[in-house]
Amino acid sequence: MNTLEEVDESTHIFNALMSLMRKFLFRVLCVGPIPTNISFIMDGNRRFAKKHNLIGLDAGHRAGFISVKYILQYCKEIGVPYVTLHAFGMDNFKRGPEEVKCVMDLMLEKVELAIDQAVSGNMNGVRIIFAGDLDSLNEHFRAATKKLMELTEENRDLIVVVCVAYSTSLEIVHAVRKSCVRKCTNGDDLVLLELSDVEECMYTSIVPVPDLVIRTGGGDRLSNFMTWQTSRSLLHRTEALWPELGLWHLVWAILKFQRMQDYLTKKKKLD
């Protein structure tokens, strides 16, 4: 057996052991309540690139996409049915035009890769939904996101909402306008506009409100991300930058959610 074959066998054994360890860990974790929807504010890609002297405007974001892959895998194995990702907010468009183009090109690259995987049946039961002001994005990107959503719409193992060109402020304006148009179209009285009418027209109305919001990079803000929907959610912050987020960070956040369950339940009842 040559050296390369030995390395391949060792890697295979290591991966198998890690998989068994995760299954055992997740089985223990599932004794307690599991969040229905976990939202991630993925902060720290640029700082990660600077910290590790990575070259290229998209270097940190490429590292961040690796974390997305693993975090989604862990959530699926745990049994979390919904995940919401703050991928690119409206405020991010205020960055330099070169960086914005670089990041959007990278996102398009990953969307097209996911399309290829969906066509070949390798999405592992994951459904992708894009939410935000998609009309503000270029036609090529919109067409790609639409195709990926169509290809994965029957998948149910894990539903992932990717928020692009998104902010809560924009979402509320959109929802109020859409609900008013609905009322007028149906001949209803606008005075009778209900809270539920607005919430039904939110970009993210297709999924439950988040139970747990995880923010990386040490920040305490929600950054205009789902502030309407997270009034009863647990916010967990971690100093880890997004590309550094791993299995144990996720497990610790869920354990914190489980410890706070009584408080969160009482808060929901009071509201």
From Swiss-Prot:
Known EC number: 2.5.1.-
The protein's name: Dehydrodolichyl diphosphate synthase 7
Membrane-spanning parts: 24-41
Gene Ontology BP term (one): protein glycosylation
Reported cofactor(s): Mg(2+)
Enzyme class: transferase
One MF term in the entry's GO annotations: transferase activity, transferring alkyl or aryl (other than methyl) groups
GO cellular component, one term: endoplasmic reticulum membrane
Localisation: Endoplasmic reticulum membrane
